[in-house]
Amino acid sequence: MTETIKNINIDLLIPFENHPFKKREGIEKEELAESVKENGLLEPIIVRSFSAGTYEIISGHRRVEVCKEMGIQTVPAIVRDMTKDEAVIVMVDSNLQREHLLPSEKAFAYKMKLEAMKHQGKTYGQVVHKSRDNISDNESGRQVQRYIRLTHLIPELLKLVDEERIAFTPAVELSYLPENEQKILAEEIEYTDATPSLSQAQRLRKYSEQGRLSIDTIFAVLSEEKPNQKEQVKFKTDDIRKYFPKSYTSLDMQKTIISLLEKW
């Protein structure tokens, strides 16, 4: 894999197709912007030659976004000669090193990597072994497989997983429900303001496989009082948004509130 280092006009850079990692606002982006302002872009982005003199970003989408917002015209880049599948693997591996990743990001990243490595003639076992080594010793092949299951969730349910309203393991169970039943479940979750526990999700899956899952069944399951249910204090984002910078995410606001309460 040959590579060269050069400065590239930022207008010639295009995002990676179907990039599974979402744009990040908030504290992390602000810190990156401050670093670029003081020191310039210290770490080159990684790209590959594309069409008509353009370059596809493999690693460094957030850095490019910050540089654009700051009016920087050129960025240092490592230009690598890569196939599409090689580019997918590098893109996924470099982004999996981020400190904070949403379950949906991991899910679609693993799926993309699995498909790319299959194109290279590698087995599933080789794929998950490499993925595990690139993340941590705790990320087993079985866990990677669970993450990929999340790609079968409809967007409404996957959003609840990212927001930590539905826990990871129950979400895996719900991913086996057909799309029409998932849509009904999402509506009932909104109506009851309750999400299924692991045991409830397992029952919903079982009822579905038996052809016994209905709106009434879903409502009855979600309406059950959970043994470990605790009283919660909830705020509407719109009610507290005015007290925080516009760039703050919901997680940033939560961390700030907890920090202030600890000092109270």
Enumerate the language-model features and the residues they cover.
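Amphipathic, charge-rich alpha-helical segments that serve as recognition/docking helices
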Residues: 21-23, 29, 65-152, 159-162, ...
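Low-complexity, acidic/Ser/Thr- and charged residue-rich accessory regions of DNA metabolism proteins
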Residues: 254-264
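Short runs of predominantly hydrophobic/aromatic residues within well-ordered alpha helices
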Residues: 63, 85, 106-107, 167-171, ...
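Amphipathic alpha-helical extensions and coiled-coil-like segments
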Residues: 112-114, 141-255
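Glutamine-centric residue-chemistry signal
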Residues: 41-43, 97, 120, 126, ...
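Compositionally biased, intrinsically disordered low-complexity segments
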Residues: 8-11, 39, 48, 115, ...
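Short, charged/polar connector segments at secondary-structure boundaries
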Residues: 1-80, 86-99
